[in-house]
Every structure is written in C-alpha cells, then in structure tokens.
C-alpha cells in the first residue's frame, strides 16, 4: 500500500480521510523527527486536512488496530524505533493502510549504507571506497582497513542518519576514537574514503529530481550542528550548472530507483574537487522537514512552497 507514484491529484482535503503524522519515536533522531512532524502537521491542517500526530511505532500500532486513520504521513527518522528501516512500513502493509515514502524493501535497504553501496556498485554507479567493520573489531583490523582504503577517511555507523556518530579521520591516531564514537550508535560500522570537494544533495519527488543543492558549511564539514542548529551554512540551489546539473539529477534518480525507493526522498552526493567525478553517499527515505532541511529548499527553487510540497507527498498515497 505504499505510495505508488502516479498522476493522482486532488484539491479536496477530505479525499485523504484521517491522516496520522508519524513522528518522534525512540531513535537517535527523535528530536529532528518531532520538529519535522510538527511542521508537516501544521502544513496539512493549514490546507484543511484532518491530521493528527502519532508519536512512535507502538502508538501507531494501537491506532491502526482501532482503525483510527485512513493513511499515514511518515516523518519518523532513523532506525531502532525510527521509521526508515522497513519495520513500520511492514506494520502499515499488514494493516493495508497507505503511507508516504518507500516500501519495506526500499526503506530497509537504504537504511543500511553498506548494502546500498553493494547494489550501486553492482550497477556501475560510483560510490567511495569502503570497508565494513563488525562490532568489536580489533585494533589491528581497524588500522588494516584504514590502510586499505587510504587516509583520509570517514567513520560512521552503518545504519544511522543526520551525521550521528560520524567522524573524519586524517591520521591513524584518530582512528580508534572515531570507531568508539560510531559504535555507540550501531554494531556495524562503515569506513569510507573521504572525498574532498563539493557536498551536494538531490531531492526526489515522484519521478522528478529537484534542483541540486550545494552545501557550504562555515566549519570544515556538514555535521549535525551545521544541519540542524547553526544558521551560517550556505545552501546554493541549483548547486551545479548546465550539463553537470543534468548529470547529478539523473544520477540521483538512478541511485534512488536502484535502491528500490519511491515516493519521495533525498540522495546525498560528493563531487571530487579535482576530477569533478560524482560519488554517491546514501539515500534518505524520510528526509527532514525542519526549517534547515534540504527538500523544502529544493522545492522552493521550483516555486513549490512548503504546504504544497507536503500536499504533493501525501497525494502519492491516493
């Protein structure tokens, strides 16, 4: 019952019935999700939609048993109590309730950065060199993996978002501290080649890639603070020009579809500062909808305001 992207359009808020805005949860991204969900809820109500907040998966399960809602707008971020790992999608499928975003497979695959990379590489799509580290990897294995990839590298949890638990490593002395930080959030870790250059992201809405955004943080990189707290990060949209812009939009669509995603989402990309080559990083299947978030910024470039964006995402459940 996930959103199958088609041409269903409506101007009648009653067509949606009662809508649950799924937010909060218990993942490490709870606060971001509460912020996103509050914005979505306000936008739907402003358009006359009968929308109610539902905090987390257990509350949603109770509501579905009681048949309280006709569809779900999912802005539950992350995994382990979040809404991007396929678990809540399976719940909604079991109850036959339409919902926004990717289905079970697309959500679960995209949450696992390592599996996503394997799919992309099998299709010839570029992604940085990487290694997987199991929980409790020895210091010898950690340093060996770093040498194989070549410094500098990124160390991150394999199944987290919002730059939670992510470190940049420029010398071997920083490695074990970075691994310890990432391991707080997930058992499996991803060690990845650090691409020096432009950080870009491309939002996908239905079958359309929106204009890319080039992210220019005031600090060295786009961390949690730059994403959600600081007001000095620059967002350039479109992030590229001409053929380069067309290329990154097509790459994002290819990567999104390869991961089995649909509905809406966001694809993060690095552009090598020397060669100009594009490298896929990850897919976000329930992107942020905060004041700092990137999907609304890209939509505005096409004249789509926030309320209209939220409406169009929900329309895909009809």
Curated annotation (Swiss-Prot):
Keywords: ATP-binding, Cell shape, Cell wall biogenesis/degradation, Cytoplasm, Ligase, Magnesium, Manganese, Metal-binding, Nucleotide-binding, Peptidoglycan synthesis
Enzyme class: ligase
Gene3D superfamilies reported for this sequence: 3.40.50.20, ATP-grasp fold, A domain, ATP-grasp fold, B domain
Signal peptide from the UniProt entry: none
Localization annotation: Cytoplasm
Keyword Repeat in annotation: no
Necessary cofactors: Mg(2+); Mn(2+)
Main localization, broad class: cytoplasm
Binding locations of Mg(2+) 1: 268, 282
Co-factor binding comment: Binds 2 magnesium or manganese ions per subunit.
GO terms under biological process: cell wall organization; peptidoglycan biosynthetic process; regulation of cell shape
Residues annotated as binding Mg(2+) 2: 282, 284
Pathway: Cell wall biogenesis; peptidoglycan biosynthesis
Binding site for ATP: 146-201
Record's keyword annotation contains NAD: no
GO cellular component, one term: cytosol
Catalytic activity: 2 D-alanine + ATP = D-alanyl-D-alanine + ADP + phosphate + H(+)
Pfam families: Dala_Dala_lig_C (PF07478), Dala_Dala_lig_N (PF01820)
Record-level Gene Ontology MF annotations: ATP binding; D-alanine-D-alanine ligase activity; metal ion binding
Ranges of residues in domain ATP-grasp: 117-315
EC number: 6.3.2.4
Top-level taxon of the source organism: Bacteria
Protein function: Cell wall formation.
Family: Belongs to the D-alanine--D-alanine ligase family.
Protein name: D-alanine--D-alanine ligase
Source lineage: Bacteria, Pseudomonadati, Pseudomonadota, Gammaproteobacteria, Lysobacterales
């Amino acid at each position: 019952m996930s959103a199958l992207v088609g041409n269903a359009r409506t101007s009648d808020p009653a067509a949606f019935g009662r809508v649950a805005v799924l937010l909060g949860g218990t993942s490490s991204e709870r606060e971001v999700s509460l912020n996103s969900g509050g914005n979505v809820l306000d936008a739907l109500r402003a358009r006359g939609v009968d929308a109610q907040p539902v905090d987390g998966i257990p509350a949603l399960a109770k509501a579905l048993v009681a048949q309280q809602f006709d569809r779900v707008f999912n802005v539950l971020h992350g995994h382990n109590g979040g809404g991007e790992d396929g678990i809540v999608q399976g719940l909604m499928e079991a109850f036959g309730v339409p919902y926004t975003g990717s289905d079970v497979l697309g959500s679960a695959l995209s949450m696992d950065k390592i599996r996503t990379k394997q799919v992309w590489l099998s299709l010839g799509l570029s992604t940085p060199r990487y290694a997987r580290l199991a929980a409790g990897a020895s210091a010898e294995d950690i340093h060996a993996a770093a040498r194989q990839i070549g410094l500098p590298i990124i160390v991150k949890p394999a199944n987290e978002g919002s730059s939670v638990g992510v470190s940049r490593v420029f010398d071997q002395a920083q490695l074990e501290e970075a691994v310890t930080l990432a391991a707080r959030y997930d058992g499996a870790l991803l060690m990845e080649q650090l691409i020096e250059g432009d950080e870009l992201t491309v939002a996908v809405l239905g079958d359309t890639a929106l204009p890319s955004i080039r992210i220019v943080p005031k600090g060295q990189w786009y961390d949690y603070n730059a994403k959600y707290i600081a007001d000095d990060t620059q967002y350039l949209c479109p992030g590229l020009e001409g053929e380069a812009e067309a290329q990154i939009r097509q790459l994002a669509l290819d990567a999104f579809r390869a991961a089995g995603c649909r509905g809406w989402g966001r694809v993060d990309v690095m552009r090598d500062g020397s060669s100009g080559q594009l490298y896929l990083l990850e897919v976000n299947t329930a992107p942020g909808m905060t004041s700092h978030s990137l999907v609304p910024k890209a939509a505005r470039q096409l004249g789509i305001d926030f309320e209209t964006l939220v409406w169009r995402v929900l329309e895909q459940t009809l």
